[in-house]
UniProtKB/Swiss-Prot annotation:
This is Cyclotide vibi-A. The lineage of its organism: Eukaryota, Viridiplantae, Streptophyta, Embryophyta, Tracheophyta. Belongs to the cyclotide family. Moebius subfamily. It comes from the Eukaryota. Disulfide bonds join 5-19, 9-21, 14-26. The presence of a 'disulfide through disulfide knot' structurally defines this protein as a knottin.
Length: 29
């Protein structure tokens, strides 16, 4: 969803558990 995980995903993946890539940032559900 909307909350930002404090991580970007220019590489296409997120390392933070429970976060997914919503280019170019990672979001938590």
């Amino acid at each position: 969803g909307l909350p930002v995980c404090g991580e970007t995903c220019f590489g296409g993946t997120c390392n933070t558990p429970g976060c997914s890539c919503s280019y170019p940032i990672c979001t938590r559900n």
